Amino acid sequence: DAKQFDAHTVLGSILLGHKPTEVHSTMVAHLTKALIGRLIDTDPAAVVGLKGCKNVAEVAARKAELLDTAYECGLYHDVGKSAVILNIDNNGRRLIDEEFQGIQTHPAIGCGLLQEAGCGKYMAPAALYHHRFYNGQGGYPKDVPPCPPEVKVIVDALSVADSLDAATDNIGRCYQMAKPFRTLVGELKAQCGTRYAPKVVALFDDKDFCAELA
């Protein structure tokens, strides 16, 4: 509808204000969609609950809709960086503590922007929780309630997708060096069950799927 179009136009304009964030967000959107699509194809029971899907048959029937939502959640997950990034990561050096604390505000800022844009049901919580650990025991922001179950699997996929692209990307990032894909997969597996969702990490056991992503 017109309201949704206007919201997406505004949000897209925000991303365009910082090209590295736009590129990263687009890549994360594609990766999140790919991960959710793979889960639907190989383990649809893991996706039950997403957007209220009650069983695997409903997951299969609504696959296109679920993939669209996964893509949008990935595309706008970092929209909150618009408030902090221009003053931080163009300096060609590692972040100082105060700057990293500023970066840590972007999930809550993004959640607020998405709620104001009328995208509060799925995209806003995806933005808020994408740096929280799968087990709820780490990450940021702190002191937030558990992630809503109707979007949790997208957040689980988004968290992996965000780490995957961020850690393999040299563009516009002064606070860490890019890593080889295999190295990152090893790190995902090392933090499986704590930071990352086991069912999402298990997708990387498929060499053909890894080849598609790498």
Q: What spans do the regions from the language model cover?
A:
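Acidic/His-rich, divalent-metal-binding segments that scaffold phosphate/diphosphate chemistry
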Residues: D1-Q104, K121
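Residue-level signal for cytosolic alpha-helical hairpin/rod architecture
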Residues: H8, L67, P107-A108, A161-L164, ...
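Short amphipathic alpha-helical interaction patches enriched in hydrophobic/aromatic residues
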Residues: L11-H18, L114, T168-G172
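An active-site-proximal "capping" alpha-helix that borders the catalytic cofactor pocket
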Residues: M27-I36, G102-Q115, P180-Y196
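Histidine/acidic-rich helix-loop-helix segments that form or flank divalent-metal centers
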Residues: K51-G74, L114-S159, C174-Q176, L188-A214
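Acidic, Mg2+-coordinating active-site segments of isoprenoid diphosphate-utilizing enzymes
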Residues: D78-G92, H131-Y140, D165, N170
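Short, charged, surface-exposed loops that flank catalytic or proteolytic processing sites
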Residues: R93-L95, G172-F181
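Conserved beta-strand-loop-short alpha-helix elements that form
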Residues: V155-D169
